[in-house]
């Protein structure tokens, strides 16, 4: 991975009371394992395998990847990624967020969302995400303070050429959730 492909940087350190903590002043606690969140400006498709975990259709990814801002979280290799877009009227939307399956449940996606909150607070008022009605994803977002705002009927039927199944549930409607920044 080329260093030129990355721009902004945030450093995270270990667990404090069970939570990954974002360090904005670049100070680290001695001996703490480090994670980095970096903005990817070029060659975003190098992370296609990870992007496809959250959005199975490459054509759908292509619709937002070019205009979106992409971040990767590295912790001895890339563990998680997210792509956000400016939807206007103060809304920042998470279009894609995924973690390598064997590293799920370790707080990486949560760290990315907290990074987005810190990075974009003051520039946007709402962080939005659309997801399927899955027992794997809805509780995750709700634990982070997102609330359901609307349902887009038949989204996964109308926009994907094949059934999308997550955690044993066929996705039909998109559930839109929002969190104040």
What are these regions (language model features)?
Residues 38-101, 113, 180:
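Acetyl-CoA-dependent GNAT
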Residues 1-12:
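Positively charged N-terminal leader segments that act as targeting/secretion signals
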Residues 128-130, 142, 147-170:
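Conserved catalytic-core motifs of GNAT/GCN5-like acyltransferases
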Residues 15, 19-43, 175, 181:
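Conserved N-terminal entry element of GNAT/NAT acetyltransferase domains
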Residues 68, 171-176:
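Short hydrophobic/aromatic beta-strand or adjacent loop that forms the aromatic wall/cage
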Residues 120-133:
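Conserved GNAT acetyl-CoA-binding A-motif
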């Amino acid at each position: 991975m080329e260093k030129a492909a990355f721009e902004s940087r945030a450093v995270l350190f270990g667990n404090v009371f069970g939570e990954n903590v974002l360090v904005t002043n670049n100070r680290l606690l001695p001996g703490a394992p480090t994670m980095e969140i970096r903005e990817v400006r070029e060659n975003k498709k190098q992370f296609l395998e990870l992007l496809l975990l959250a959005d199975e259709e490459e054509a759908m990814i292509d619709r937002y990847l070019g205009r979106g801002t992409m971040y990767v979280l590295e912790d001895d290799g890339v563990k998680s990624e997210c792509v956000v877009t400016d939807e206007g009227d103060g809304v920042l939307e998470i279009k894609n967020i995924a973690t390598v399956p064997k590293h799920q449940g370790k707080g990486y996606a949560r760290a990315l969302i907290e990074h987005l909150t810190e990075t974009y607070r003051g520039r946007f008022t709402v962080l939005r995400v659309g997801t399927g009605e899955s027992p794997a994803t809805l509780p995750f977002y709700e634990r982070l303070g997102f609330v359901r705002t609307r349902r887009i009927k038949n989204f996964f039927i109308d926009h994907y050429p094949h059934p999308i199944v997550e955690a044993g549930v066929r996705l039909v409607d998109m559930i839109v959730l929002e969190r104040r920044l």
